[in-house]
Amino acid sequence: MKQPSNWIEGMSMELKKKKKLAVCVPFRDPGDGVRDKHLAEFVPYMNQFLSERGFDFKIFVAHQCDDKLFNRSAMKNIAFDVAREEGYDYFAFHDVDMLPEDGADYSYPNEHPVHIFTNLSQWDYRLRDIEYFGGCVLFTKEQFENVNGYYNDYWDWGMEDDDLFWRCY
């Protein structure tokens, strides 16, 4: 194996070995513009946050445009399917209204799914609920396929994260 001749070449070789991260964001603005504002803040923030840390990533926003109740599960599964087809290795299922702070680790989840937002500023950095599995969770492709993704029969807000938690653990 050829050894790098300098630091820049070494970094280039290391970057080629990186896993590709898909940030999967379910999205729907209920008409009040609040979620649109969240998305307008989320995308540039995440681009900067992940770029500064050297991640190879792409943000996939699955936007539900019909008048039915929001199906966050279906939007997450759709984003996963598209990202998987594009060859991504692991997936961050991310709420649009939650932004990571320094210390949030989006690294490849080797052994099991990883819940990134266990302690949030909105809860004074205390764990809200031992079973809370929302905000942002990381899965490898294999881990997500093994639990068969999110269950698509949860409509409106909530429960899909709890259901996934129980199927993972």
Predicted segments with their positions:
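Conserved catalytic core of nucleotide-sugar-dependent glycosyltransferases
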Residues: 67, 71-76, 80-83, 90-94, ...
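C-terminal interaction modules of eukaryotic adaptor/scaffold proteins
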Residues: 64
